[in-house]
Amino acid sequence: MENSLKSSGKPLAAPKVGMVSLGCPKALVDSEQIITQLRAEGYEISGTYDGADLVVVNTCGFIDEAVQESLDAIGEALAENGKVIVTGCLGAKKSASGSGLIAEVHPKVLAVTGPHAVGEVMQAVHSHLPKPHDPFVDLVPAAGIKLTPRHYAYLKISEGCNHRCSFCIIPSMRGELVSRPVAEVMLEAENLFKSGVKELLVISQDTSAYGVDVKYRTGFWNGRPLKTRMTELVGALGELAAQYGAWVRLHYVYPYPHVDEIIPMMAQGPLKGHVLPYLDVPFQHAHPEVLKRMKRLANAERVLERVQKWREICPDLTIRSTFIAGFPGETDAQFETLLDFIREAELDRVGCFAYSPVEGASANALDGALPDDVREARRARFMEVAEEVSAARIARKIGKTLKVLIDEVNAEGGIGRTAADAPEIDGVVYVEPAAKASKRYKVGEFVSVKITGADGHDLWGEV
């Protein structure tokens, strides 16, 4: 155990952080990672209490003696410096009353996190000791380098996938599911909103599985515990979006049961209008035998019931999905079941691919491969039905006034999107020019648009 910070009369004005590291080698590695990240972001490390702008204390809570030593170290840091962030095993320990032990003994600490929490520690450091941004020196903005327009951005929350769909080789390329630490995700989201992003598109290979690999481990954000789980993450992102008047849109939502918990957030309460009533759910097919061969969830009737229940709770819900037509062994009757599902579910936006073998996919070994012309004919027929359903749903929006995010401004007015439209893959709204110069639209702003027309894909409207 080491506490190398001592008092000296050498005050420094630069952003400097002191580090007290206690506990086992695993805790020492955590401290090394924190220091590495601090240095990577331009902070300096102070060897004295009074030479530091704040102090991070990495604690141990394994045995009573270690608990007391950690509490004493926190007290010393508070007395010598006054600004203290606490991390490590003791951060997760409760007192006899059930509250956090550290907060009860030392209520003046700035923030408390658990172990393995580099992201949470850095978020706390940023909150209490912001790193000055010098545009002449710093090459990378806090939000990172983005290839999307300034007003929307993608937020990847995990990598890899635990499914073994027979038509897919993603797990062999990207590996098993690895969820990003929840504080790291939240920090990136906050930086994006601060940079002017008005729409955050949450993506992964399987958004619904977020946190499964870490058993929904509890992290910390803004001084409060936050589970590494989709439901809790969406709620926290929605709260953050509300602070900045922004949107959160969910993509690649595999229809696990806990997805039902998200729907009320979209329909009511303070998150309504921020967690968008939009789900991108990759159903892929509707016949149980085909789904079984795909190694997908096979209870299509249950899925249809859930879709209908979602719409009862949230009538404005937009559902986008993707499907595969002509999968090996798909019969005419099974394909008709798929078309019936599209009609009954009234999906708003769909894409369909004619099945095509992918090198390395287990589906290549399935019997019943269909000729190319049959696969393509089924894809075309599917899209005919899907477009009929979509056109009918879009037509219901005529006469309504909708919130539109402007993506482009030109001589003909503006082009934007509603809550029902993700960029690049869904429709757009063509907005007539503003009547007055002072009312001209700006890219990245929200405007209220009265819908005056529609086709099978896009809308037209006026302010």
Swiss-Prot record:
SMART domains given in the database record: Elp3
Cofactor note: Binds 2 [4Fe-4S] clusters. One cluster is coordinated with 3 cysteines and an exchangeable S-adenosyl-L-methionine.
Chain ranges of the Radical SAM core domain: 147-392
Keywords, sorted A to Z: 4Fe-4S, Cytoplasm, Iron, Iron-sulfur, Metal-binding, S-adenosyl-L-methionine, Transferase
First-listed, main subcellular location of the protein, grouped into a coarse class: cytoplasm
GO cellular component: cytosol
Function: Catalyzes the methylthiolation of an aspartic acid residue of ribosomal protein uS12.
Descriptive protein name: Ribosomal protein uS12 methylthiotransferase RimO
Species: Burkholderia mallei (strain ATCC 23344)
Gene name in the database record: rimO
